[in-house]
Curated annotation (Swiss-Prot):
Entries under SUPFAM superfamilies matching the protein: Serpins
Protein name in the entry: Uncharacterized serpin-like protein FPV204
Any one Pfam family match given in the protein's UniProt record, by short name: Serpin
Family under the similarity heading: Belongs to the serpin family. Poxviruses subfamily.
Organism: Fowlpox virus (strain NVSL) (FPV)
GO cellular component: extracellular space
Alphabetized GO MF terms: serine-type endopeptidase inhibitor activity
Keywords: Protease inhibitor, Serine protease inhibitor
Length: 342
């Protein structure tokens, strides 16, 4: 299970997290497209065979921006077919640089232009012997979506992993019927916020206590993860309070991917489908993700006097963003909120 394997590599107790399993899968598939021999075999073992439509839906650009680029030193004479396939299949730009000192300027100019300044920069982790970097970036916002019938701003006490607590700004939604299920094997409640822009779902995975994510990450399996996203849940009338927040995170995936068995990519890899120059190597796998879980369309209303169960998202939790109607095991975004202020 690709997403779970990566989550287990990245998880750090008490620390926030945000990455795009779908985006990482895309750029690794893009690299695999130009690999042969053991390098390709190791990527085959890590990646799932499903190929997605990686094109951008212009109608959803107010919610999501997803871009990727492969930056290669000019001396490697990139295969023209690989460039074309990167563009048409994986929606990835292929650019060249002459000197490693150019990389930050080229990368940041590209990311500002392609994201319409929603993302302004990305760390490149360059070295004197950098030969190529593949980077992927995603911006996802819920600010302009009204997914609740009646909401108001609130403040809740959030209980952090380290035993402290802090007040956080929250959304308070009046009672509503949500897809909901309790998973006893991972001791978590799962609530689904659905049809964001009529295109996306968000799943909130809330452990029983503030340290429960340790047990969840240790014990969650691909089967359970798939059930969360694919099985029909019962609808339950709940009064929801959950934090509003923004998370921005950059990740260099070289070590996690190496740890997941793709050693050849970084040691004598066979990239003959990308370049015929034998010493070509992949020097960096970088991702930057930004999510805004905020709501512009908040009404100032008085609470309804309706009795029902409460669902307070007041401890560290996992959130997953998926496509509506495309329930699969490689989410668009997967993150952990730890209670940091907005």
């Amino acid at each position: 299970m690709f997403a779970i394997s990566v989550l287990k590599e990245l998880y750090d107790s008490g620390e926030p997290l945000l990455f795009s399993p779908r985006g990482l899968h895309k750029i690794l598939c893009n690299i695999r497209h130009g690999c042969n021999g053991n390098t390709k075999n190791q990527l085959d073992n890590l990646l799932e065979e499903t190929i997605y439509d990686y094109g951008e839906d212009q109608a959803l650009k107010h919610i999501i921006t997803n871009i990727s680029v492969l930056l290669i030193k000019r001396c490697y004479n990139i295969n023209e077919k690989f460039i074309k396939d990167s563009n048409t299949i994986y929606n990835t730009d292929v650019l060249e640089f002459y000197n490693v000192r150019q990389i930050p300027r080229i990368m940041n100019k590209w990311i500002r232009s392609r994201s319409n300044n929603k993302i302004t920069d990305i760390g490149c982790h360059i070295y004197d012997n950098t030969k190529s970097i593949i980077a992927e970036a995603m911006f996802f916002t819920m600010k302009h979506e009204s997914i609740f019938g009646s909401t108001r701003k609130d403040t809740i006490t959030f209980y952090k992993y380290d035993g402290t607590s802090l007040p956080v700004e929250a959304i308070h939604a009046d009672p509503y019927y949500y897809p909901y299920r309790y998973f006893d094997d991972i001791k978590c409640s799962v609530l689904q916020l659905w049809k964001l822009g009529y295109a996306f779902n968000m799943f909130i995975i809330l452990p029983d206590d503030e340290k429960g994510l340790d047990n969840l990450v240790d014990n969650i399996t691909g089967d359970v993860f798939s059930k969360i996203m694919t099985e029909q849940m019962d609808y339950k009338r709940l009064e929801l309070r959950m934090p509003v927040f923004s998370i921005s995170q950059e990740t260099n995936f070289c070590m996690p991917i190496f740890n997941l068995g793709c050693h050849s990519m970084f040691i004598d890899g066979d990239f003959s489908g990308i370049s015929e120059v034998s010493d070509f190597q992949l020097s960096g796998i970088i991702q930057k993700n930004i999510i805004e879980v905020q709501y512009d369309k908040v009404k100032t209303t008085k609470p309804l006097n309706v009795r029902c169960s409460s669902f307070y998202v007041n401890k560290p939790f996992i959130f997953i963003v998926t496509d509506v109607g495309n329930y699969d095991t490689i989410p668009i975004l997967l993150g952990i909120y730890q209670g940091s202020s907005k």
